[in-house]
């Protein structure tokens, strides 16, 4: 395929495409290839190339239009985030197309986007191996909260906040990546008709009962809040929140079918309360009472099973209740406390 043989080519902007890293399935099911790339100034970047050959070979104009639409939207939303100076979101260094001389038109044109080269992601750094620095974990989680808030402030909801989508860079900086399936308040996203666009295994529990709130665009923030709290829970406990919650709820119901969200909600709350008690005890053992109380409050409010009572209940208006300001502040406070108490 054209996108798998770009090594040695140079883009119009001067980036040299170096070694191939891997092939992946892109956000819209398109075939993507990842490379290291070097700028004219010697900066190392990460290049994601999109191969349109699958869409072209399908013989379907609809498939081709959808594929191009998804790519153009991702490029547009990334450029928008860059222009808005979203410091905790991964934005492009360059984008465009490169001609592969080994193929004929139109297959020879390969679209690409280049990003800063990351050192890893939260899954590789903190889940797949033993955590050696909790202060770095909390710093990363603070950055994630800031990144989600930045997206919300410019009318974007991510809905796929998970460890592999949080990239780690030099100087212990973390940023949110993979904006290919986000939705926006202007309705430009090709995925606007979907109530949830991310990984279902990390999704809030209401999704599993087809009870996702859908009255207003801001309701999509319920998912981002839950996924942020779930990320905190995952990094500390080592397990994903939603699958455990569903399993424990089924045990409470003696494995009877969970027919509706409303019927399951009392059992979900009971199971969630037990999980939060266990989470608090684990945090207290690891970090002490003060920090564990803050972490318990954050996760409980962000992941509460009844989404109508999720977020900062001090406020009744959604724009304030679904704001991450309180939780960003608390994560900053936890960072300071780990430093003061000598927790590494």
Task: Please provide the spans of the model-predicted regions.
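ATP-binding glycine-rich loop module of kinase domains
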Residues: 33-80
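Conserved C-lobe activation region of Hanks-type protein kinase-like domains
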Residues: 218-223, 232-288
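Conserved HxN/HPN-centered segment at the entrance to the catalytic loop
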Residues: 76, 82-103
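Juxta-kinase regulatory segment immediately upstream of eukaryotic protein kinase catalytic domains
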Residues: 1-23
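Conserved short submotifs of the Hanks-type protein kinase catalytic core
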Residues: 104-121
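Catalytic-loop of the protein kinase fold
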Residues: 152-169
